[in-house]
Amino acid sequence: MLWGGAARAAVAVIFPVGAVAQEVTPVVGVGLVAVGFRRAAVVILGAVGPPGDGEMRESLMAHGARWWRHRWMPEHAAERAVPPAMAEQLQARVNASETRHSGEIVLCVEAALPNRDLWRAGREAPLPAVIRERALSWFGKLRVWDTEHNNGVLIYLLLAERCVEIVADRGISRHVPDAHWQAAVQALGQHLQTGDFDTGLTQALQEVSALLVQHFPLQAGEANPNELCNRVVWA
């Protein structure tokens, strides 16, 4: 994970649906994520491991099925799930949202995990933990952590597992209870099951926007500096 600058604290919230939901149990815990040569505290709400004694290894059949599910995702699957017209509408909603607060919202849609993460999932680490690390990696690559008020938020959608994570920088996460993040993620998770990505992403965006307006409203005469690109990221 390549996070530059000072160590930043973020809250990662995962709500699994579909195949992932059958493999994990909800817990609340605290972990550490390497940030260059420093560490940032990460609060995890949701499902972080399989039920029982925490055994990470899974059957060869299950591991193989996941591998093929990810590798057989159609070319440009992210663009098909969120086509250009939908992406433009989502970008317009982000633009409108950021006229009301000083935060930054980034939407990232990824078709499948890369091979190195697929190999680790269920063998070296639980699948939800691998997905969480992937979301945190995008949080760093897209520089969502690098905002003036530490109030950037990443909404990350992994199509192959139909699951979502919201990663928020410390400026906003310290103001917002876990229950609020869970509600935002659940709103998207319910629509993922039916493939209604537009409605789900819009609802999640509205939830995040409302929290940013509440805690980081723009004052009279102020303008959002738009520190990060508002276009949907297809990965």
Task: Give, region by region, the residue ranges found by the protein language model.
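Periodic low-complexity repeat segments enriched in small/acidic residues
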Residues: M1-M61
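Divalent-cation
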Residues: M56-P225, N230-W234
